[in-house]
Amino acid sequence: VMAVPYDMYISGYDTDAVNKLVLWSAKSPNNLDMTAFSRGEYVRSLEENTMAEVISKILYPADDHIEGKRLRIKQQYLLVSASLQSILLKHIKKYKTLDNLPDKVAIHINDTHPALCVPELTRILIDEYGYDWDKAWDIVTRTLTYTNHTVMSEALERWPESLFSAELPRIYQIVLEINRRLVQKLNEVYPGDIAKIEYMSPVAHGEVRMANLCLAACHK
């Protein structure tokens, strides 16, 4: 799946300032399956592209069923990954390094929907730019901030661990490592208090808790 950017320029009131809002659309690299088309399977020939476009067709699709949950996590990952990759590419082009990313860029996680920023930024720095974990995590924690808009625990996004690991296996690996390191620190602060440590952990009781993940990584 490819994320295609659409830039919308927004002018301010009574000022010369213009801001850019980037919207993303999901597309398949293969618009048409010519093999299926040649066999007369016209609907099937468009299936791959159609399924890719579904990801960004409706923002926040209903997730009261398993297919809706799968679609929503794919959508969140696409928007997060595309935005982060765009930010980092522009930063590299200008500064030739990502070492100074926290000094030049602030990435704000507004509620839990973009919380995948935490593991995805970590993944990009490690897998695509060759940072070791400690350096990557230092950059992540100094770049990301988080706002939570509710105190109701039922409104904080949680994913079934089985779904999360199936849809985002590499991201799941990184989340587990974040969780392992955090639990290790919590054990030093609250030795033996298993209930408190589980309550604060990003991964516990078969769930991946996005708010806890943000709190583990964000400096504000």
Q: Predicted segment positions?
A:
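A conserved ligand/cofactor-binding region detector
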Residues: 1-220
